[in-house]
């Protein structure tokens, strides 16, 4: 039906007869002439109808926005004064000789001239996706997946599919369950990841695997999460953690170079402990120049319990955050930031405004200055590198609260005061995570997942001191987003059972949930390691949007609902009966 895409016409097509198919983006009726902007997935081109083609002109008078049409005409160059530099096709136009209205459009529920609500955009997603910016994002996503496949194929990886209907295993979130009609009362689970299957593939001898795969997690959603999402899933045998990181870094550098024309360079590597200490986060945004600086040793003897208490507590921390130019902040702004850090458990926000450093105590403004000597103030200013016009905020509490509160404040100030370089790319690897963390109930939970191997520990050493274990794990972070994470896996049955035991999974439970894995580990399992990237998040970064729903064709809301299809929906009684699922009705209030 078409010979060319609208958005691909250029001066090289001048004089050619073309047939285009697409939609009316805009119509301008000048009486004897009618101009339309015609749109398809590749872009927009101007088409005009003149009196010499009376039939086409007459039919064009009926056109309205979003009519689906076919146009045949001749490409010609625009006069210099009519060139539109803002359009890729702005140097040419199409003189229409014939027009076919394929389908008319009713009054549109989305307004092209105004910002539509996200609810409306999701309800009429098929119209929203016609917008050039949305089409471009999905085209970029398609390009990314194509680049990934070619790169992985070139590096000897095999694309192998794993099951969608599998067994529920604890991986950190709730499973989506699918009832079995054949096995009444039993349920499949949709996979949260292909984790165990890709490990089993390594045990099967396929030493380089990848898959672009759908995963499902029934969890509370955030702006950058969806109940169903897509992973670039990777696993390798006989490769060390640095070797895996090297290949995966090369993949991401390849994507940025091909999609953005940007060479990311070599990624720095930072330990979890260093990231938390310097940035208050295990996914630091290195575009932001501010860092947390420890000052507890300077404050142990001050007559101010808010500082002295944590400074003398082995589990406590006192840290300072220097804000360049922050002395300009008003009292109201400071109070607002004080309320902000309370969200993260902080009790308040002490500060020092540096007006004239050379004047010592007389050159600062601080509600805690009366508790500090001139020498202590000077030592704090020296350590933080403070200059005239800066602000220093303090966090004093247990280590987690200080990291969480000042880490979040750092990000907020970076944005509010334009200190974060939005034009920069800042990737890094974060390694050496704790293997376990407190579950809040006196037990331990796996920081990544229970199949991650510890670094340099035997099973007996791990059993004796699990809190000291460092995971052989690694996360890739770009601009403060965790875009991928992975680890070296446990390939020894004794170690795997030890980890299960530390997590409170008894032997009977181990057999019920992971018997197939424990059996497989008995038969010459190779050392293996892998990683998974979030394709949605990678695409979000590469397309410059901050909403993950913008890069998914048909996303869910933050309530895990599809406004367009009205999913989820009630199942009819016959279907439930066939599945052996009884419906319990709530008793009515009398």
Swiss-Prot record:
Q: Which residues bind L-aspartate?
A: 171, 217, 448, 489
Q: Where in the cell is it found?
A: Cytoplasm
The entry's ATP-binding residues are 217-219, 226, 482, 534-537
Task: Name the keywords, alphabetized.
Answer: Aminoacyl-tRNA synthetase, ATP-binding, Cytoplasm, Ligase, Nucleotide-binding, Protein biosynthesis
Q: Which reaction does it catalyse?
A: tRNA(Asp) + L-aspartate + ATP = L-aspartyl-tRNA(Asp) + AMP + diphosphate
**GO CC terms of this entry:** cytoplasm
Question: Which BP terms in the Gene Ontology apply to this protein?
Answer: aspartyl-tRNA aminoacylation
Q: What is its main location?
A: cytoplasm
Return the Gene3D superfamilies for the record: Bira Bifunctional Protein, Domain 2, GAD-like domain, Nucleic acid-binding proteins
A molecular-function term among this protein's GO annotations:
ATP binding
Q: Where is this region: Aspartate?
A: 195-198
The cross-references to Pfam families, in alphabetical order and at most eight, read: GAD, tRNA-synt_2, tRNA_anti-codon
- SUPFAM superfamilies under this entry? Class II aaRS and biotin synthetases (SSF55681), GAD domain-like (SSF55261), Nucleic acid-binding proteins (SSF50249)
Indicate yes or no for the key word Ligase.
yes
Q: What is its EC number?
A: 6.1.1.12
Per the record, the similarity remark reads:
Belongs to the class-II aminoacyl-tRNA synthetase family. Type 1 subfamily.
* NCBIfam families assigned: aspS_bact, PRK00476.1
Per the entry, what this protein does is: Catalyzes the attachment of L-aspartate to tRNA(Asp) in a two-step reaction: L-aspartate is first activated by ATP to form Asp-AMP and then transferred to the acceptor end of tRNA(Asp).
How this chain assembles, per its entry, is: Homodimer.
Q: How is this protein named in the record?
A: Aspartate--tRNA ligase
Supply the source organism for this entry: Salmonella paratyphi A (strain AKU_12601)
What phylogenetic lineage does the species belong to?
Answer: Bacteria, Pseudomonadati, Pseudomonadota, Gammaproteobacteria, Enterobacterales
Gene coding for it: aspS
